Swiss-Prot record:
The gene is tpiA. It comes from Amoebophilus asiaticus (strain 5a2). Substrate binds at residues 9-11, 176, 216, 237-238. Its EC number is 5.3.1.1. This is Triosephosphate isomerase. Homodimer. It comes from the Bacteria.
Amino acid sequence: MQRTIIAANWKMNKNFQEGLQLAKEITQFIQAEPLAGAQIILFPSFIHLEGISKLLTPEVKLHLGAQNCHDQIAGAFTGEVSAAMLASIDVRYVLVGHSERRQNFAEDNDLIAKKIDAILSCKLQPVFCCGEPLSVRESNQHYAFIEQQIAESLFHLTPDELQQVIIAYEPIWAIGTGLIPSLAEIEEMQQTIRNILKKQYNTVLADNMAILYGGSCNASNITKLISLPGINGVLIGGASLHFKEFIHILRSL
């Protein structure tokens, strides 16, 4: 049975001290109230990674992820951070393909595929984000849109490589808006994603892929979201920045 994955994307929030304090509070909670059925991954800003990594011990069931990395392992890329650098400070996961990276930095499926290769080459796990804008959903083209994102970003991977990928379905129109698809729509989309993978790979692999839902997840809807049989967890944004709300989410598992 897969654990429920709770991935917390802090985005560009919290200064160094604020981020470290929040991470300390979360680790103290996990030590006091172990969550046997959950896998918790924090995705703070780059400035927090090393400090938070020092809080992690075998007793603290908390994992560390980065919000981005470069597609090359090293070189003259001013301002960039490589997957190899992240691996050196105990980062285990890297977000890739998030809609904010696609929209604000013009990252396309080809670049995302290269980033995934770099992440895997450093023995890290990619958390691959896919999702459609509202205009695509309203024109009933969302299935084809998601299939193209997956095909161009993931289909070059071997089955063994694909098994290392976590997929996060985040409809763009639901991110930070308070809007959320119906439970039936979320369940339908996760099944669509699995069907896409079945056609390219095989049923066993597709059925065992970890698929998360992201987009306006919070304490009021977490129980319903994680009750969906095909959803293996959630990717949380704003709600993960507030200790009390995040703990409420964890206690709902």
